[in-house]
């Protein structure tokens, strides 16, 4: 017994020594990690590097960021201020909040900072994209791509977008059970991008497979850039390769078949615009361009669409006020038949309350957290030095949350954007859901158009109810969305705004 007791004590002592050694090793390595980045400050500048933590060696604070969601930024902002350092997705990063700080970054493009997304994002989207280009190459690409989102182009997309949304809402209403809104919104925006924007005639079965692959791609766009088996980055690469094969096949088929089209889609405009600027696009450039267009139209628009539906559920008075505006304009139609062509851009621009609703959704539930830049030369920001070579992320969502021009920032209140209050009129950089400066989102008008049409069709043709006891919590990666997708039961409406039972809706859908 004595020897057994001594052996147990010895084992415990050994275990304790190992734990102490590991703890000391972690503490020392973490301290060296902090010193390693502190040594990168610009010695010619007397200002200090922003406060903050670089987390653990190699992984930094990536784990905290993924687990804490919006709490990560807010907790560190409260502790360190509007400018703080961290280490995310394999690189050192300074996160910036506040209109004046963001203005300096956005207006400093090409001389203070240059765009640089995380390595995983750059590699997965591809080198030929607008988002990854800089300088003259970026300016030239924007000129080529800008025609895709011109007033004339948007007018031609509008009837097709309206039909896709009508068909989708009819299918939602005919479904006997509640649907996962976020998942279905992803399918809707993906279908819109493939069918309307790009004009691809992909069979339904192939489209479903392509959607699943694209989901895998998007889920790993913001991942640690570690190319190992079973890593998120490796899954993203594999998804990209599969998508590129599918896109090349669709592009070649589309280029060979030009008959029977009643409008020019985005891919047609892109090819023609490129020729007008004296450049014939290669197949690789076309594949990267279409992949970027789908990415831009898919993830962020699905996020905003889900947020729109969630807020209309939470605020029935807002939905009723929207219906009143549509009724006054003669736009509150029945969902019993397709109404292609009933909406025009000038009609939508005259719906002022609808515009306020969309603006408020984008203020309170901005799909993306912010934008990334790399520092070209050391500069001052909020009393700190921002060293050359570091990365900077300007925070859109937190700038909205802390903007002094907005009253009761956590309250969903579309009237804040009405003519009587116009809270966004003071300060250009307090409200920037689509970024700003020379890299303002090219597709912002298409995104707003889609959301407005969705809101009009929801108000006209649907009643919807939350299918769970409480609303789901929100996560921010890769874009803002409900954790459990938002379970909602939809019902169709007749011409008198009365519910249509699912079985009746199914019969109506079968006859359309």
From Swiss-Prot:
GO molecular function term, any single one: retinoic acid 4-hydroxylase activity
Residues binding heme, per UniProt: 441
InterPro entries on file: Cyt_P450, Cyt_P450_CS, Cyt_P450_E_grp-IV, Cyt_P450_sf
Cellular component aspect of the GO annotation: endoplasmic reticulum membrane
Cofactor requirement: heme
CDD domains: CYP26B1
PANTHER family linked to this entry: CYTOCHROME P450 26, CYTOCHROME P450 26B1
Similarity comment: family membership: Belongs to the cytochrome P450 family.
Biological role: A cytochrome P450 monooxygenase involved in the metabolism of retinoates (RAs), the active metabolites of vitamin A, and critical signaling molecules in animals. RAs exist as at least four different isomers: all-trans-RA (atRA), 9-cis-RA, 13-cis-RA, and 9,13-dicis-RA, where atRA is considered to be the biologically active isomer, although 9-cis-RA and 13-cis-RA also have activity. Also has a significant activity in oxidation of tazarotenic acid and may therefore metabolize that xenobiotic in vivo.
Official protein name in the record: Cytochrome P450 26B1
Taxonomic lineage of the native organism: Eukaryota, Metazoa, Chordata, Craniata, Vertebrata
């Amino acid at each position: 017994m004595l020897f057994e007791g001594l052996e147990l004590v010895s084992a415990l002592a050994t275990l304790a020594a190992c734990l102490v050694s590991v703890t000391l090793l972690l503490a020392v390595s973490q301290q060296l990690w902090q010193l390693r980045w502190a040594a990168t400050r610009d010695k010619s500048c007397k200002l200090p590097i922003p406060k903050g933590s670089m987390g653990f060696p190699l992984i930094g604070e990536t784990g905290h960021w993924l687990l804490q969601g919006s709490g990560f930024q807010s907790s560190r902002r409260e502790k360190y201020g509007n400018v703080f350092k961290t280490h995310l997705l394999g690189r050192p990063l300074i996160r910036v909040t506040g209109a004046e700080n963001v203005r300096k970054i956005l207006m400093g493009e090409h001389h203070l900072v240059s765009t640089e997304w995380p390595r995983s994002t750059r590699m997965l989207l591809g080198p030929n994209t607008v988002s990854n280009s800089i300088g003259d190459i970026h300016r030239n690409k924007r000129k080529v791509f800008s025609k895709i989102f011109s007033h004339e182009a948007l007018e031609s997309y509008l009837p097709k977008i309206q039909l896709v949304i009508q068909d989708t809402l009819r299918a939602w209403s005919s479904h006997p059970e509640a649907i996962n809104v976020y998942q279905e919104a992803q399918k809707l925006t993906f279908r819109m991008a493939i069918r309307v924007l790009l004009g691809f005639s992909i069979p339904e079965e192939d489209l479903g497979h392509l959607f699943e692959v694209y989901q895998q791609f998007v889920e790993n766009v913001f991942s640690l850039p570690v190319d190992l088996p079973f890593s998120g980055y490796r899954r993203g690469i594999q998804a990209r390769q599969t998508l590129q094969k599918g896109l090349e096949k669709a592009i070649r088929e589309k280029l060979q078949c030009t008959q029977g089209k009643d409008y020019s889609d985005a891919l047609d405009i892109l090819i023609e615009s490129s020729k007008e600027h004296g450049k014939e696009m290669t197949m690789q450039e076309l594949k990267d361009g279409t992949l970027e267009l789908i990415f831009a139209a898919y993830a962020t628009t699905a996020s905003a669409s889900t947020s729109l539906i969630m807020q209309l559920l939470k605020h029935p008075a807002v939905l009723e006020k929207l219906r009143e505006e549509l009724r006054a304009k003669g736009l509150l139609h029945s969902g019993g038949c397709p109404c292609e062509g009933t909406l025009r851009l000038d009609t939508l621009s005259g719906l002022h309350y609808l515009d306020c609703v969309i603006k408020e959704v984008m203020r309170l539930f901005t799909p993306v957290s912010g934008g990334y830049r790399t520092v070209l030369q050391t500069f001052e920001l909020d009393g700190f030095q921002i060293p050359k070579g570091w990365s900077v992320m300007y925070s859109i969502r937190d700038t909205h949350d802390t903007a002094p021009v907005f009253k009761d920032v956590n309250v969903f209140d579309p009237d804040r954007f009405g003519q009587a209050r116009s809270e966004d009129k003071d300060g250009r950089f307090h409200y920037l859901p689509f970024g700003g400066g020379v890299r303002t989102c090219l597709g912002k008008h298409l995104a707003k158009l889609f959301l407005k049409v969705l809101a009009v069709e929801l108000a006209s043709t649907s009643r919807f109810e939350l299918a769970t006891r409480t609303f789901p919590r929100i996560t921010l990666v890769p874009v803002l969305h409900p954790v459990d997708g938002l379970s909602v039961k939809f019902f169709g409406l007749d011409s008198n705004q009365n519910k249509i039972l699912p079985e009746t809706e199914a019969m109506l859908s079968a006859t359309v």
